[in-house]
Amino acid sequence: MKRLLLPLLAIAAATPLMAQNERAPFVIEETGRTFWRLDDAVKSIGEGQGTIVIGPGQFKECAVQAAGSITYRAAQPGSVIFDGVACDGKAALVFRGIFARVEGIIFQNIRVPDRNGSGIRLEKGDLEEDNSIFRNSEQGILTNEGPTMNVKVDRSTFSGLGGCPDGMCSHSLYIGNNASLSVTNSRFEKGTGGHYLKSRAAMTQISGNSFDDTRGRTTNYHIDLPAGSGGSITKNVFVQGRDKENYSAIIALGAEERIHRSVGLVIAGNDVSIAPGIDRETTFIGDWTHEPLRIGQNKIGPGVKLSDQR
């Protein structure tokens, strides 16, 4: 069995529940002001710029950032958990400002009536997310349509996410028609339906990630770029598991519509295989665009065809 990329998170050995202590858990780094509720800390920054440092704890709360530029940082990576609460029926953190950055936070058990419960919902502005975990929810990160929005994800884990219970699907990471998406050094695993990464962004960089489907259930594509995309998919490890709703391809390009040009999309340096003990065939790149791609050297395992046009 080949070695897969391991999560790069520095997780605390034990995560304490929110305790009664003398110091409020939400601290504005620039001023030292403290708050007992995250939403109050966010509102205190308003249209300005600031960093909220979050003390260890498991929090049954959420927040909406309506303006400004805010960084949300765990004082100790992996010691902060947002558990089971979504604002506006959407996510633990809903972003409608200019910019948001999230560092070292765990999001879990988030479910809402429309089955799009997410750790992060980006409705406006740019997002940078680093060193976090999204687990056992309907979705990890979901973004609205927004052709000027940019999303960067680094060193993070997406586990136990997604589903298509009635044909309306959620995915581990779902990006709308945005300007760009970058996903690096991250791990996708144990999907519970839908795709691991679905993006309608015009430009895509997906590099150095692990897509481990060996314990997935009723999953579909590892990467779905349904509207086409430029950019690159490089140096990733893909393993297709047994329990698939659709095992016809690892990467799907332009399967729904062609909004963005895919000419020159680089797909190289990837390691692609079907999990041991599974006797079937699949295709690494299912291409509906018929545009000239730049497919370089990839390590392709038994039963995997490099590409086909559909």
Model-derived features with residue positions:
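Surface-exposed or flexible loop/turn and strand-edge residues in extracellular/cell-surface modules
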Residues: 23, 49, 56-61, 67, ...
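Right-handed parallel beta-helix
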Residues: 55-56, 69, 73-79, 99-109, ...
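Extracellular beta-strand/beta-solenoid scaffold signature
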Residues: 84-93, 113-121, 136-145, 165-175, ...
